[in-house]
Amino acid sequence: IWDKERYLNWMYENLMAIKSVMSDNASIYVHLDWHIVHYVKILMDEIFGEDNFVNDITWKRQTSSGFKGKNAMGKNHDNILLYCKGEDFIHNTQYLPYSDDYIEQRFSHKEIINGKECRFKDAFLGTATTDATIEQLKRDNKIYYTSSGGMRLKVYLNETEGIPLDDVWTDINAVNSQADERVDYATQKPEALLERIIKASSDEG
């Protein structure tokens, strides 16, 4: 087991080497636990610059670790520090699917289009919407009329991408001992976690 000073020296050298080969639009994600994350954050501020700090992502692993008792709470998350090389870094917003309850509450309107039930919500049109735009929306069946005769915009469920991902990730579990993807590596990351990171910070091809 490494002591803290040796680990931080090793981490510093590796981060410097990684930065030297990063492209201008690249990002780096560093997965850490509660023991060391705050120390590594200071290193990364020095190496990449405080202005290039993007997010401290909280990844809830679903299984608690460490002492749990009257003097401590179970530790149920790790941290993923995200830094970019510069202001031109790639960022593709990722989305989470709506829950059934969310759909029921927010997309509460229904209508039949081409024999199929479609859900939608109504949204504010905006004061800058021109008459020409409103007429086009009417032709496209995108105007919802309220009981008082007001006009709102129809936003169909099948035209939305979901809920934009924030910096608290609770939907990806750690790799358990029975998982098909398990390779017996102590700090193995779930494929779903790696896929999310790749999609968020790189373009296809």
Name the predicted role of every residue range.
Residues 1-205:
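Core catalytic lobe of class I
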